[in-house]
Amino acid sequence: YFAISGSGPGILAEFLASALNVQAMLWRTSPSATELEEVTLGWLRQLMGLSESFEGVIYDTASIASLHALAAARQRAVPSVRVHGLAGRTDIGPLRVYTSEQAHSSIDKAVMTLGLGQDALRKIPVDEDFRLRPQALRSAIAADLKSGITPLAVVATVGTTSTTSIDPI
């Protein structure tokens, strides 16, 4: 069971988000929303018993969070992509994103949107409980490294939409 934005709490959250109508990602553009986000993340940090170094950003959907996480991974792997992009680049080799066969379709979409291409996404086989098989992941990464492919990210799933399976993270 997954709560949706059409649930009671979801409707209230959507109401508040639309009423604020801000991007809280930068203090400069929206100081009050950024402060609210910091307080909320502090509560989450306390509830989960995480260290003070835990930081984050609140997104409206998991799809956007995945897109931004993969964009950050791409930026870290190829810092010049921000200025020069990926098109026609001969100075970087192929990049690879790994995820399970049960991953949400937003991962496919993010890989395409970020200009990595569908060939950059490797879907790892799952076990009988629909969880990513760690040994298959290790083998895929080793084979790619041997072939000159740079691992960019591993996207684990915590509760697939079809089976609620959780990858062994």
Task: Please provide the spans of the model-predicted regions.
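PLP-dependent aminotransferase-class I/II
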Residues: 78-85, 89-151, 156, 163
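A generic secondary-structure signal for well-formed alpha-helical elements
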Residues: 23, 44-48, 73-80, 162
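Cysteine-centered functional microenvironments
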Residues: 20, 24, 52-56, 122-126, ...
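Conserved beta-loop-alpha segment that forms the PLP phosphate-binding cup at the N-terminus of a helix
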Residues: 37, 41, 55-86, 106-111
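N-terminal entrance/gating region of PLP-dependent enzymes' catalytic architecture
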Residues: 1-53
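Generic hydrophobic alpha-helical segments
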Residues: 44, 69, 73, 137-141
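Catalytic PLP-binding core of fold-type I/II PLP enzymes
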Residues: 165-169
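Short acidic-aromatic active-site loops that bind/stabilize oxyanions
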Residues: 25-37, 59, 63, 96-100, ...
